[in-house]
Amino acid sequence: MNPAHLLVLSAVCVSLLGAANIPPQHLDLYQFKEMIRYTIPCEKTWGEYADYGCYCGAGGSGTPIDALDRCCYVHDNCYGDAANIRDCDPKTQSYSYKLTKRTIICYGAAGTCARVVCDCDRTAALCFGNSEYIEGHKNIDTARFCQ
C-alpha cells in the first residue's frame, strides 16, 4: 500500500475513534442552543443560561426571580404543552427554522409538534436576548430562593 494512503487511512481511523467517544446531543437542544447564541450579547455563552434562577436548567420550582428566569418558566410550560401533542417529545423533536435579521423564523404547519417546539424555543431565545442577565442569579441555592 502507498505510504501516503496508509497515513490518510490511519488519520481517518484515529478521528473516528475520537468521535466515538463524543456523546450524542439531542438535536432540538442543539437547535435551541443555536437560537440562544444568536440572540444573547456576545460576552455571554449559551451555557451561562443553563443554571440560572429557579427555572433555567433542569427542573424548576417556585416563583421566577427575574425577567430572564420568567423566560425559562414560560419555556418549561410551553414544552409541557407541546408534550401533550401525540408522539411529541420536545427535547428530541427537530424542526426547521431560519436565523435572519436579528429574529428567528420557524417553519412548518401550525400546531404540529415540530412547529410548536420551534415556537417555544424561538420565544425563549428572543426573551433571553431582551432580558437582563444578573450575575448573582447564576447557580443560586434553589432550596432557599425557589420556594
Curated annotation (Swiss-Prot):
Subcellular location: Secreted
Signal peptide: 1-19
EC number: 3.1.1.4
A cellular component term, taken from the record's GO annotations: extracellular region
InterPro entries according to UniProt: PLipase_A2, PLipase_A2_Asp_AS, PLipase_A2_dom, PLipase_A2_dom_sf, PLipase_A2_His_AS
Binding-site list for Ca(2+): 55, 57, 59, 76
Cofactor(s) of this protein: Ca(2+)
Name of the protein described by the UniProt record: Acidic phospholipase A2 beta-bungarotoxin A4 chain
